[in-house]
Amino acid sequence: MTRTITVTGEGEGAPPVHLHCTDSGGDGPPLLLLHGLAGHSGEWDALAARFTPTHRVVAFDARGSGASTRRPGDVSRAAHVRDVVQVAQALRLPAGQLVLVGQSMGGITALLTAAAHPELVRALVLVEAGPDGPSPSLPETIGAWLDSWPVPFPDAEAAAAFFGGGAAGRAWAAGLVPGPGGLHPRVDRDVMVATVQENAHRDFWDAWDEVRCPVLVVRAGKGMLKEQEADRMAERRPGTRIAVVPDAGHDVHLDDPGAVFGEVAAFLAEVDPTAAV
C-alpha cells in the first residue's frame, strides 16, 4: 500500500512537506527503511520482500527525493529526523518497537533519530553509515557527481549502465522518470548539495554516544564505511555488532540483499527472540 504523509516543520508558517510512503501493513514488528542521498524507497524492495512475511515494513522517499516534495525549504538533519517521527506517528507504529534501518545518509538520519528519541526505537541498523566527520569537500563532491549525470538518459538500459550495471545500476535507473528527451532524475542538484552541507561542518559522534538501543553496523568490503570507523564505533559503544559483506560496494543492500537480510535477521533474532524471522 502506498500513501502520502504530510509532515509539518518547526516554526509558524513552515510549509508542509509531502512524503511518499510504502507500507506493507500487517501486525508484525515495525521495520522502517531509510534510503541514502539522491535515492528512493524502491531501493529497499528486495529486502522488504524478505521481511514482509514477519514484519510490518515501511519505507518512504526522503524529503527532496523520489515522489516526495522535491524542493523542501528545510533539508537539515533535524528536519529528516522529524520526518521519521511524524511518519511513525501517522502510521501508528508502536513506540518502543520500531527497528530503524538506514543506508548511507539514511543511516545518519536513523542514528540521529535513535539518539534523540530512545522511546521510539527498539533497534538500529546502520548500513554503510557512520558518525565520522566533518567532510568539508562533500558538498562539492556531490555536486560534481550529480553534474556528471548525462541527463536526459535515452533509456533505462543506458542509465543502468551509467550507474555501474547490475542490481544497483537497475535500482538507480528505476529512480528516474520520463521527461523531455528521455529519463530525468527526481532530485534537484542544489537540494542534494544543501542536504549534505551539515556533514561538511560536523561529525555525529555525540549522537552515537547517546544511542541506547542495540545496534548492527553493516559494512561493505568495497564500500565507503572504513574498518577503522566501524572499529571506533564498537570501541565507544561496547555491544555494537559489526557485520561485513566482503564483495559488495556502498550500495550493499542492492549488491547483495540476501546477505544484508541474513545479517539483519540474525541481529533481530538476538534483539527479540520472540519475533520469528
Report each predicted region and the residues it spans:
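Conserved acidic catalytic loop of the alpha/beta-hydrolase fold
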Residues: V81-G96
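Catalytic histidine-centered segment of alpha/beta-hydrolase-like enzymes
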Residues: A248-P257, F261
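Glycine-rich nucleophile elbow surrounding the catalytic serine of serine-hydrolase chemistry
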Residues: Q103-L112
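Alpha/beta-hydrolase fold catalytic core
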Residues: M1-L31, P53-H55, L93, A265, ...
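Flexible "cap/lid" loop of the alpha/beta hydrolase fold
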Residues: L112-A115, R122-P152
